[in-house]
Amino acid sequence: MSATKLTRREQRTQAQHFIDTLEGTAFPNSKRIYITGTHPGVRVPMREIQLSPTLIGGSKEQPQFEENEAIPVYDTSGPYGDPQIAINVQQGLAKLRQPWIDARGDTEELTVRSSDYTKARLADDGLDELRFSGLLTPKRAKTGRRVTQLHYARQGIITPEMEFIAIRENMGRERIRSEVLRHQHPGMSFGARLPENITAEFVRDEVAAGRAIIPANINHPESEPMIIGRNFLVKVNANIGNSAVTSSIEEEVEKLVWSTRWGADTVMDLSTGRYIHETREWILRNSPVPIGTVPIYQALEKVNGIAEDLTWEAFRDTLLEQAEQGVDYFTIHAGVLLRYVPMTAKRLTGIVSRGGSIMAKWCLSHHQENFLYQHFREICEICAAYDVSLSLGDGLRPGSVQDANDEAQFAELHTLGELTKIAWEYDVQVMIEGPGHVPMQMIRRNMTEELEHCHEAPFYTLGPLTTDIAPGYDHFTSGIGAAMIGWFGCAMLCYVTPKEHLGLPNKEDVKQGLITYKIAAHAADLAKGHPGAQIRDNAMSKARFEFRWEDQFNLALDPFTARAYHDETLPQESGKVAHFCSMCGPKFCSMRISQEVRDYAAAQTIEVGMADMSENFRARGGEIYLRKEEA
């Protein structure tokens, strides 16, 4: 934890400097590689970790080495991870998907914005200094057309996005030749389908079945295609966003870039303070990953924070505003029904979801059904016109382990399953949000209930936190639950930072939350038996046993922390080649002793073999050549 707290001015200045000096940066001893597909422009980025050779013998003067293969890994950093690409936040990222969108011929540019709020913001000269300068002309589906990846998948069309994803999900494992690295324990997949090789047709089939989604708004062409589904790698979401009391546009863009560097597969902008519209534009134009929002937050701002004053018209305008900016998925709390609210009365912690509490208050004050539920088909029509995926929010999720798996939670979940079928009628992609706070023994039921009642739509959970006693460490309490539910089939995990329940996370908190959740997601992939998931573990173990310290650092999820911890006690360069670490020292290093035992055993085997041959030679009379019948 930092010893000195920066002032607000210092934080903004630091963020501005980060943006102004931003350039493509590779991780230590890594390089950016691209694997091309058959569709024009399909060029899938990955990070390749270069490894040093293994000493296998020879003399001090003439050592003999064996090369170690480079390890390809999934990379969410987009252009920010390529030192060859010039970064200019003022201009935004290259529009990777624009040619693919245009080639389909089913969209049209809008001459005027559909949202009244957007029109008002654009007409306000006072916002010129805050506004992103390179605004896109938004597109929407032509009349009578649907432009969703689900629609294409159901038509049997393999889009460039699907091919991109197939290559990306395979993680370049076909490049690995070593049997040691390719070895993998069988997993327990709990019914997940995990093919040895992911093809574009498999991606299409999973999307068509509703088991996976590709969040890819036609107005966010900068994003690199990714997929969320239990038959693919477990994904991680990072939340960012300003509030009424802290953070700025510069800081949120900095957090976006930082999040993608540390492995965020998607980012949710949960801004609730001033300049929500302008902040979101900067984020979208500079984001290589899908961006999600909770539109009710901004709709509430438009009615001065008074939940009772919310209207369908204000909410609809917000959906159009955000869809035309390029938001890839909306969290919609349409399952918080009026009749479910009394079910929460006996809870220890009531309704803890911000969106859920807003809708519950609206329902009670008007004594009417949730307007999101009532207008759900209209919501789907909007989403189908821009390919905005729906993340059906768990507004009644438990906020404490005491409230886990209660009547209200599962009543809402069943309603989300009904809404999923409605969304699919409109070819709208859907995932389901889940808890929350759930003790370990109760976690699996959440997954089985979701699969049964939500028709195998992807599950997306916040943790869950497995205990409530550790404020300041809730990235850890939730990481346990995240690893478990990821193993059981959860498709995406929403990270929790050390600041959960305590305050708005800063840059370092974002990193800590992401590293924790990348560990959880990877552990789940290993447990499921996702093909190739163990390659990096095997490479790390081999480097560890061979005392290749630099490779150990570079294979780590966080190379900088691994190196820093090592250097606290062995800072000299000689420590990077030592056959021990400071924990056991040179005489008691288990791996060094193990190597000596293995070498000794190998030598003993040779000696015993030679002795046996010698005895056999003497028993046959000591003749060099034997007659054929004696041989």
Swiss-Prot record:
Zn(2+) binds at residues 437, 501. [4Fe-4S] cluster binds at residues 581, 584, 589. GO terms for biological process: thiamine biosynthetic process; thiamine diphosphate biosynthetic process. Its cofactor is [4Fe-4S] cluster. Keywords: 4Fe-4S, Iron, Iron-sulfur, Lyase, Metal-binding, S-adenosyl-L-methionine, Thiamine biosynthesis, Zinc. Its EC number is 4.1.99.17. Gene3D superfamilies: 6.10.250.620, Radical SAM ThiC family, central domain. Pfam families: ThiC-associated, ThiC_Rad_SAM. GO terms for cellular component: cytosol. One of its GO terms (molecular function) is zinc ion binding. Pathway: Cofactor biosynthesis; thiamine diphosphate biosynthesis. It catalyses: 5-amino-1-(5-phospho-beta-D-ribosyl)imidazole + S-adenosyl-L-methionine = 4-amino-2-methyl-5-(phosphooxymethyl)pyrimidine + CO + 5'-deoxyadenosine + formate + L-methionine + 3 H(+). Substrate binds at residues 239, 268, 297, 333, 353-355, 394-397, 433, 460. InterPro entries: ThiC (IPR037509), ThiC-associated_dom (IPR025747), ThiC/Bza_core_dom (IPR038521), ThiC/BzaA/B (IPR002817). Binds 1 [4Fe-4S] cluster per subunit. The cluster is coordinated with 3 cysteines and an exchangeable S-adenosyl-L-methionine. Homodimer. Catalyzes the synthesis of the hydroxymethylpyrimidine phosphate (HMP-P) moiety of thiamine from aminoimidazole ribotide (AIR) in a radical S-adenosyl-L-methionine (SAM)-dependent reaction. Belongs to the ThiC family. HAMAP family: ThiC (MF_00089). This is Phosphomethylpyrimidine synthase.
